[in-house]
Amino acid sequence: MISNGSKTRKNLGAIALAGMVISSMIGGGIFSLPQNMAASAGAGAIILAWILTGIGMFFIANTFKILSLVRPDLTTGIYMYSREGFGPYVGFTIGWGYWLCQIFGNVGYAVMTMDALNYFFPPYFKGGNTIPAIIGGSILIWVFNFIVLKGIRQASFINVIGTICKLIPLLIFIIITAFFFKLAIFKTDFWGHTATKTQPLLGSVTSQLKSTMLVTLWAFIGIEGAVVMSARAKSPNAVGKATILGFSGCLIVYVLLSLLPFGSLFQHQLAGIANPSTAGVLDILVGRWGEILMNIGLLIAILSSWLSWTVIVAEIPYSAAKNGTFPEIFTIENAAHSPKVSLYITSALMQVAMLLVYFSTNAWSTMLSITGVMVLPAYLASAAFLVKFSKDKKYPNKGPIKSFTAKYTGILAVIYSIWLIYAGGIKYLFMAIVLLALGIPFYIEAGKKGKNAKTFFAKKEVTKITIIAFLALLAIFLFSTERIRL
């Protein structure tokens, strides 16, 4: 029997968990938000996009908050909610897909870090896939591995400091753009209906809204950070508070960051600024020192988010293995109660993926799009479980959240999750199914060696495996015959 160390320490409070949520959501992409939003929409459509996204993500955030309160026994909820509600195979598949998603996402942080360094040391790290960039990224993969090995609490403390440090440049950006804000400029072509010599018509408000929401929907990936770490939280209440605090804080920052520049620069000017566009905006408004500050902030943001996701990504297989869904070897801890084997295996897979970046940038970009879609079923399954549990007689109606509230929160979160999956791209979803099917042998292996073989291989679980395998084969056929193209 493999020893998995002592009982998991519950030493993360609301602040540490909120730092995890904010840091996992606010990565390097936020420093490109002004240009990304202005590229296809006017200020009016951007406001509508944030309102709709904010409402949708509120229901997802509230889903996690409610579940942490009414089912505090289910730790690392992003995986456990799926397992509890829909059986071991769905739980495994959600955990497997989420794990793969974050492995590739972390390597994306490595690429972005090296590319950001190129601003200070051109041309050695250009594109993030040169030999110096691969070496630098590989070193950082293992540096973060050893930081987390020192202990989750210590890593979380470093992450809180990093979160504060990356919010400072963003706060300075908000203050400067607010200082230069002119309402007359902001109101100019508010709905994006005027063409210029360099900028064609943006189209209807509906088309602007659709293209802009493709940006906003990814802004909140990571909202589940506190839930994933709930096994190490001081209390279920801390998980709920951290999720809502992180969501609210990020939404405010996103809205201000994407709208305030419209008060000092016109839409076509913002759309033409090179990324990271926060640096370009400050270069125009205050000079080169502003550009340098934003590029430093970009580096801090990426590194801080990378640390957060290193903690989170190792926690998924560790937690899944503790109840037998992943191979038992993932449960091994070190003296600091960090998931040692899970960290080493995860970092090794990241290292392999980092080497692949050197050979094929285009294939890597496609892989990031595919794995980005793979996180969304976890949101859908969690919301669906809340709907299911709200109808259960065991639901604690005497608690702070009534079943009626839980039910309709879950329903609205389900609807928004389905929209996210659709907007993410059906072709990427098909490829994601292929990657999910690759986990089937690991599920079978875990089932054979676990105590719950009958449950793992019950008729309904075999049916689910068969459906995923069939869909994966169908996807391979569609791609090989070019009926669907990436």
Curated annotation (Swiss-Prot):
Localization (cell): Cell inner membrane
UniProt keyword Phosphoprotein present: no
Main location, first listed in the record: membrane
Membrane topology recorded in Swiss-Prot or TrEMBL: Multi-pass membrane protein
Family: Belongs to the amino acid-polyamine-organocation (APC) superfamily. Basic amino acid/polyamine antiporter (APA) (TC 2.A.3.2) family.
One Gene Ontology MF term: antiporter activity
GO cellular component labels: plasma membrane
Function: Catalyzes the exchange of L-arginine for agmatine. The arginine uptake by the bacterium in the macrophage may be a virulence factor against the host innate immune response.
Record key words, sorted: Amino-acid transport, Antiport, Cell inner membrane, Cell membrane, Membrane, Transmembrane, Transmembrane helix, Transport, Virulence
Transmembrane segments: 12-32, 41-61, 85-105, 129-149, 161-181, 211-231, 242-262, 296-316, 341-361, 367-387, 418-438, 461-481
GO biological process, one term: amino acid transport
Official protein name in the record: Arginine/agmatine antiporter
Source species taxonomy: Bacteria, Pseudomonadati, Chlamydiota, Chlamydiia, Chlamydiales
PANTHER family: AMINO ACID TRANSPORTER-RELATED, ARGININE_ORNITHINE ANTIPORTER-RELATED
One Pfam family hit: AA_permease_2
Bridged cysteine pairs (disulfide): none
Top-level taxon: Bacteria
InterPro entries for the chain: AA/rel_permease1, Amino_acid_antiprt, APC_superfamily
Keyword Ubl conjugation tagged: no
Gene3D superfamilies documented for this protein: Amino acid/polyamine transporter I (1.20.1740.10)
